[in-house]
């Protein structure tokens, strides 16, 4: 039974928990599980898990991401840990990008791929390829404030429309 669930999940490129009945149980205890490993962020965890539950209950827009969250605060308060534990609890990949590496205007092509006529055009971008491979994932854009404004514009498209087309039209 679990082998079948695993195979179906891989074929459909969805989390294994989505195929089994354990997703409902996992969502019920998501806030409690996160609070057991991340301390002092109860309000943020409550808001985060509330949005995820609403979306997974079918009350969100299926064309958009489950949620887009901005965790701000000083070093060491649990921003990165929340995303790591969330991915683990949901049974999905964590895609982490250090956005301080994307300070220059041309760096956006590293995320979505080079435009036609440029070196590396045949290859996709780091972000777009990863999301194609793992469409159900938690994406962590660490130190986003350091990224170039063109990166923000790309991310606004993702948050607003729920889509991003790479250089290969995928």
What are these regions (language model features)?
Residues 1-170:
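AAA+ P-loop NTPase nucleotide-binding core of proteostasis motors
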């Amino acid at each position: 039974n679990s082998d079948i669930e695993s195979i179906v999940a891989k074929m459909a490129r969805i989390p294994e928990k989505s195929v089994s009945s354990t997703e409902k149980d996992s969502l019920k205890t998501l806030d409690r599980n996160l609070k057991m490993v991340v301390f002092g962020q109860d309000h943020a965890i409550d808001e985060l898990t509330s949005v995820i539950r609403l979306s997974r209950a079918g009350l969100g827009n299926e064309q958009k991401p489950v949620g887009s969250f901005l965790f701000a605060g000083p070093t060491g308060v649990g921003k990165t840990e929340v995303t790591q534990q969330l991915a683990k609890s949901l049974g999905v990949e964590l895609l982490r990008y250090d956005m301080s590496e994307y300070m220059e205007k041309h760096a956006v092509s590293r995320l979505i791929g080079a435009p036609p006529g440029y070196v590396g055009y045949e290859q996709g971008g780091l972000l777009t390829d990863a999301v194609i491979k793992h469409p159900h994932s938690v994406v962590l854009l660490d130190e986003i404030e350091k990224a170039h404004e063109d990166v923000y514009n790309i991310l606004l498209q993702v948050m607003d429309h729920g889509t991003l087309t790479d250089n290969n039209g995928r």
